[in-house]
Amino acid sequence: MNYDSQQPPLPPLPYAGCRRASGFPALGRGGTVPVGVWGGAGQGREGRSWGEGPRGPGLGRRDLSSADPAVLGATMESRCYGCAVKFTLFKKEYGCKNCGRAFCSGCLSFSAAVPRTGNTQQKVCKQCHEVLTRGSSANASKWSPPQNYKKRVAALEAKQKPSTSQSQGLTRQDQMIAERLARLRQENKPKLVPSQAEIEARLAALKDERQGSIPSTQEMEARLAALQGRVLPSQTPQPAHHTPDTRTQAQQTQDLLTQLAAEVAIDESWKGGGPAASLQNDLNQGGPGSTNSKRQANWSLEEEKSRLLAEAALELREENTRQERILALAKRLAMLRGQDPERVTLQDYRLPDSDDDEDEETAIQRVLQQLTEEASLDEASGFNIPAEQASRPWTQPRGAEPEAQDVDPRPEAEEEELPWCCICNEDATLRCAGCDGDLFCARCFREGHDAFELKEHQTSAYSPPRAGQEH
């Protein structure tokens, strides 16, 4: 019974843009398309899902190229069997003389001798052209396994033939046991034992081999150090061993003094008789000796010159420093006298040269006299303090009334203040009313006030309170 004859006629394909049978548009499962391929390439009739047909499971969307040509031929009505192009007025239909399928002129471009037409050259499709030109022998050789595979299979069959004759009538398990037993026997066979002659020949060959010299330990260490990038052990400097000094400190001092005395004696002997003796010896020599003595004499002169210049520069710096100090002292003295310190020059206080001892003593006496005058001026000015008040501490009379406290009102907090100078933390001797009652020593008060403040600021003597008066 022909099953295909009972199928209804299939509608034509509406896809004119397809180039081949396997190039249909991708369709989702369960879709409905007018592709009437019985066997699964879409839906041929309504109510059938994708991949189903009257013949069971279909070919699937990707199996159109492997479908039966007879089935696909029914669906390719008025279309090219090779590129699925619809035949039109400009795309005419041609038939293959061998298989009879419809092709366009582009797909039917091969020529071959067709047996149906008396081996005459006819237009055929590509598949028929390959079949007709290669023949059956070519197809057989195309799908035939290689010769090496055939030889191995034949050798395996020949090897298994005797075992098959012995294992006839045995079950599968018995055959497996027999094969395992044969393998164990093959493994337990004694190996080939070499003869006495072979052993002697091998021993003689080993003795005849030329044995190289064994490297020494030093060579191996050197090679290892070279590979690791380290210093060779032979080139490593040995650590110097210093014996401990067992001398006492007094002995070390005495030895050091002896060494210094010996070095001084050598220097004195070289300075005393060395140059003269060398010059006398150079009189009997030619050129090289005289040149060496000249070089040595020149070097000594240069060294003496450098030393004298250094001493002169040092003396000049000391002289400048001394003059600056004298000028500063003169300006300070002029300020205390009430003169303009800018008009004071160093000519007024020029000291004689220090080469003369008597003049230097005179200069020292002059400086001392100036300092004495400065001290007397400080006492004369007194910073508005009487001399007897500066020498005698301030005490309150016993019979003083409480109203006397109004003259110099002091809060209770000031009684606990520290008796130190507010600048240098020395013992305070003055209290300046113009500086909010701050405590000063005589030196800081003089340096911290200018000429106007020294005249205007009122001061009073200050003595630190005793321990019994604090509380």
From Swiss-Prot:
| Protein role | Key regulator of abscission step in cytokinesis: part of the cytokinesis checkpoint, a process required to delay abscission to prevent both premature resolution of intercellular chromosome bridges and accumulation of DNA damage. Together with CHMP4C, required to retain abscission-competent VPS4 (VPS4A and/or VPS4B) at the midbody ring until abscission checkpoint signaling is terminated at late cytokinesis. Deactivation of AURKB results in dephosphorylation of CHMP4C followed by its dissociation from ZFYVE19/ANCHR and VPS4 and subsequent abscission.
Q: What is the effect of changing residue 76 to V?
A: In PFIC9; several lines of evidence suggest that M-76 may be the main initiator, a variant at this location would therefore disrupt translation initiation
> Domain notes, please?
The FYVE-type zinc finger mediates binding to phosphatidylinositol-3-phosphate (PtdIns(3)P).
**Where does each FYVE-type zinc finger lie?**
74-133
* Short motif (MIM1-B): ranges: 326-339
Output this protein's name.
Answer: Abscission/NoCut checkpoint regulator
Give the species this sequence originates from: Homo sapiens (Human)
- Biased composition range(s): Polar residues: 278-299
Disease entry from the Swiss-Prot or TrEMBL record: A chromosomal aberration involving ZFYVE19 is associated with acute myeloblastic leukemia (AML). Translocation t(11;15)(q23;q14) with KMT2A/MLL1.
Question: Phosphothreonine is carried by which residues?
Answer: 243
Keywords in alphabetical order, please. Cell cycle, Cell division, Chromosomal rearrangement, Ciliopathy, Coiled coil, Cytoplasm, Cytoskeleton, Disease variant, Intrahepatic cholestasis, Isopeptide bond, Lipid-binding, Metal-binding, Phosphoprotein, Proto-oncogene, Ubl conjugation, Zinc, Zinc-finger
**Entry GO CC:** centrosome; cleavage furrow; cytoplasm; Flemming body; midbody
In alphabetical order, the GO MF annotations are: phosphatidylinositol-3-phosphate binding; zinc ion binding
Disulfide cross-links: none
Record's InterPro entries?
Bbox1_ANCHR, Znf_FYVE, Znf_FYVE-rel, Znf_FYVE_PHD, Znf_RING/FYVE/PHD
Give residue numbers for the modification (Phosphoserine): 144, 293, 354, 463
Cross-link type Glycyl lysine isopeptide (Lys-Gly) (interchain with G-Cter in SUMO2), placed at 207
